Amino acid sequence: MKFVDEASILVVAGDGGNGCVSFRREKYIPKGGPDGGDGGDGGDVWMEADENLNTLIDYRFEKSFRAERGQNGASRDCTGKRGKDVTIKVPVGTRVIDQGTGETMGDMTKHGQRLLVAKGGWHGLGNTRFKSSVNRTPRQKTNGTPGDKRDLLLELMLLADVGMLGMPNAGKSTFIRAVSAAKPKVADYPFTTLVPSLGVVRMDSEKSFVVADIPGLIEGAAEGAGLGIRFLKHLERCRVLLHLIDIDPIDGSDPVENARIIIGELEKYSQDLAAKPRWLVFNKIDLMDKTEAEEKAKAIAEALGWEGKYYLISAASQLGVKDLCWDVMTFIIENPIAQAEEAKQPEKVEFMWDDYHRQQLAEVEEDADDDWDDDWDEDDEEGVEFIYKR
């Protein structure tokens, strides 16, 4: 199945049903009073995370989702039926962005998580709501309000513990094939990897972590060169980044300059991503003897001003790979995701008609107070003023 990590859709919630103007008329009850019911609320549009999905390709073809309108009110105080909700299923890891305002509505990070993205319109009020002591036959009603309408951008971001980045042909896909059951394509030409892939690294029966492989970066990726930097978003949720460096590039390029290009593109994309823990991993050490590889790796690290630990591996022959994986596993265990970060969600999204219903009822009560006349003044806005005399 084709991997699609972005899609734009239109969601429209259902309109609220209109209120009804009706009066009770039965035998022997000629003046039964108002009995018009309220309309029904419009249906909502929800997002739901589903772990069985892994792409947004369905929403490249189906782009519009509309919830059902609420039914109108009826006589005999019958309230209209509420409109049916619409649920849109997306892969776990999807971020929902309102393209109109630019706000992030939510991150779908857990299976079964639900997010309200468009709220249905409020129901209209029937004339029963407007009766008062001085207005026994109200002919007022209100119509239902329109439902929310939003243009949404869906961004699928892979959920992985470890992210891999580097130049094309640095050996990222070979590494993920060596440590997991994932089988990304491997070849001797640049940009063999065209889409991100995930692999589960099982250290033993109880310990494992997920690693993400993304297409390689080249100079100018931030301006769209190569495959650009749009795949870097898949590393935003990773806890540690493995920066793979080809210690002896076949094209004769300078490994130090290659590493600086990656760091520069990372900083152009996001300062937060550039600040994540990043480990240097020198790959393809099987192409030279051990002493030469160690000397070359040390020289590259010094040229980069690298003061931390670095690793020498050969993904093809799996030399040094197991030790690296155990160190990664230890780091993940010692640095669990903070509860505050895990529970972090965007601020509450405001919907169009959040306060409408409360305002409507307040206006009805206010009108009723205005209609009350205690006969202490000379003015009556409606009805007959009775003057009693002895």
From Swiss-Prot:
Chain sites annotated for binding GTP: 166-173, 191-195, 213-216, 283-286, 314-316
Region ranges (Disordered): 127-147
Residues reported to bind Mg(2+): 173, 193
OBG-type G domain segment(s): 160-333
The Obg domain, residue ranges: 1-159
Top EC class of this enzyme: hydrolase
Transmembrane segments: none
Localization per Swiss-Prot or TrEMBL: Cytoplasm
Alphabetically ordered keywords of this record: Cytoplasm, GTP-binding, Hydrolase, Magnesium, Metal-binding, Nucleotide-binding
EC nos: 3.6.5.-
GO biological processes: ribosome biogenesis
Cofactor dependence: Mg(2+)
Annotated Polar residues bias: 129-145
Self-association state and partner proteins as the record states: Monomer. Binds RluD (AC P65836) as well as the 30S ribosomal subunit protein S9.
Listed PANTHER family: DEVELOPMENTALLY REGULATED GTP-BINDING PROTEIN-RELATED, MITOCHONDRIAL RIBOSOME-ASSOCIATED GTPASE 2
HAMAP family tied to this protein: GTPase_Obg
Chain's role: An essential GTPase which binds GTP, GDP and possibly (p)ppGpp with moderate affinity, with high nucleotide exchange rates and a fairly low GTP hydrolysis rate. Plays a role in control of the cell cycle, stress response, ribosome biogenesis and in those bacteria that undergo differentiation, in morphogenesis control. Binds GDP with a dissociation constant of 1.7 uM and GTP with a dissociation constant of 6.5 uM.
UniProt protein name: GTPase Obg
Taxon lineage: Bacteria, Pseudomonadati, Pseudomonadota, Gammaproteobacteria, Enterobacterales
